[in-house]
Regions:
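Extended, low-complexity, turn-rich repeat/linker tracts enriched in Gly/Pro/Ser/Thr and Asp/Glu
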Residues: 213-222, 234-237
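Extracellular carbohydrate recognition and processing domains
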Residues: 239-304
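Extracellular carbohydrate-recognition regions
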Residues: 97-134
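Extended extracellular/luminal ectodomain segments enriched in beta-structured repeat modules
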Residues: 43-44, 199-208, 219-223, 303-307
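Short carbohydrate-recognition loop motifs
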Residues: 143-182
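Beta-rich interaction/scaffold domains
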Residues: 1-103
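Extracellular carbohydrate recognition
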Residues: 286-288, 302-305, 315-338
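Extracellular/lumenal carbohydrate-interaction signature centered on repeated Trp-anchored short motifs
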Residues: 172-207, 282-286
């Protein structure tokens, strides 16, 4: 210790609801304490802290016992001074960032065996699945056990239906319109409303996720898909309607938003061209938990966006009703990775 060091930092509470934050780190060389807001409510807000210092040092943001209260009008930096016992001073910065993570991305909270919380519904989108309801009672997305010591996870399974069409297990950020499933069988994309409002003050590099994959009928029989997308709504006065692309790759005619960045990976247990025509860029051991990274790609400068979605499917060509019955994709511990 040099006499003017910050040795520890803990966030105790906030004066307002809707806020959460985590300590990123203490950079002694550059005299910076970095805190990341995971969730923000209505500013201004007071962050109550406990901060450890060098022996008998004091600071301008804490009392003699190390307790302090720092008010923020926004996500902003706050300078403070640490004074050593001998009177030496050093200027520090309490740096804040806003790099939120997805709610319940470790999938420990469920309403029931089929519905992770928060549940995506019209007007309040979040975790949703095309398997939440079906005219043929397909329960392809369910709660399962994660890797050892990791609690609960999500399992997506590709199944047959009584009407002869294959149904892939799916999960995405948004909401699913189950009002007319039989009438929309020729346009399944129209039932998926992708996207949740999202913002950060740092660019997103991609997403990290724990996965387990098992193809239903041998190594070449099927592949799963993992994707992350940034979406920009054209007119913010309207309600977002974004169905992504049709199975043939064309954009859905009802979209009122544009995809401005995407990361997409095909996961399989075998390299090369698979029976469904896809080629995996993530080749993993069968039925074994792995941590993978899906990079976000875009042209030019980092794009402005209004919404974000992530999508997962146990059969990567499931929107074309292609795949293998019994294919399983398990996911857990999704984490957005920032630059």
């Amino acid at each position: 210790e040099t006499g003017t060091d910050v040795t520890s930092f803990r966030i105790v509470s906030f004066s307002e609801s809707g806020f959460s934050a985590e300590l990123v780190g203490i950079d002694t060389d550059n005299a910076v304490v970095t805190v990341n807001f995971l969730q923000t409510g209505r500013f201004p807000v007071t962050m109550n802290i406990r901060m450890g210092l060098s022996y008998k040092a004091t600071s301008t943001i804490t009392d003699q016992y190390g307790a302090g209260a720092v008010e923020f009008a926004r996500v902003e930096d706050k300078p403070f001074t640490v004074t050593a016992q001998n009177g030496e001073t050093r200027e520090w910065t309490l740096r804040t960032t806003y790099m939120p993570q997805l709610q319940n991305a470790d999938f420990e909270r469920w309403a029931n065996l089929q519905t992770p919380l928060p549940k995506g519904i019209k007007g309040s989108p979040y975790w949703a699945s095309a398997n939440m309801t079906s005219p043929v009672v397909v329960e392809g997305t369910t709660q399962t056990e994660g890797a050892p010591g990791q609690g609960k996870a999500v399992q997506m399974e590709t199944k047959n239906t009584i009407i002869g069409k294959l149904a892939a297990g799916s999960l995405f950020l948004g909401w699913f319109d189950d009002s007319n499933p039989m009438g929309n069988m020729n346009d399944p994309a129209v039932m998926m409303f992708y996207g949740i409002p999202f913002s950060s003050n740092q660019p997103i590099k991609g997403m990290q996720v724990d996965i387990l994959y098992h193809p239903g009928n041998g190594p070449s029989s099927d592949s799963g898909s993992l994707a992350i997308e940034l979406i920009r709504q054209r007119d913010l006065s309207q309600e977002l309607e974004y169905h992504g692309a049709n199975p043939d790759g064309t954009w859905h005619s009802k979209n009122n938003a544009d995809r401005v960045a995407r990361g997409h990976s095909i996961v399989a247990t075998q390299a090369g061209t698979l029976d469904n025509g896809d080629t995996a860029d993530l080749v993993v051991p069968d039925n074994t938990w792995q941590t993978v990274f899906v990079p976000l790609e875009y042209d030019g400068a980092y794009p402005a966006y209004t919404h974000l979605t992530v999508t997962f499917s146990s059969s990567s060509k499931g929107d074309s009703y292609k795949g293998a019955v019994g294919s399983i994709l398990k996911i857990d511990n999704i984490r957005l990775i920032y630059e």
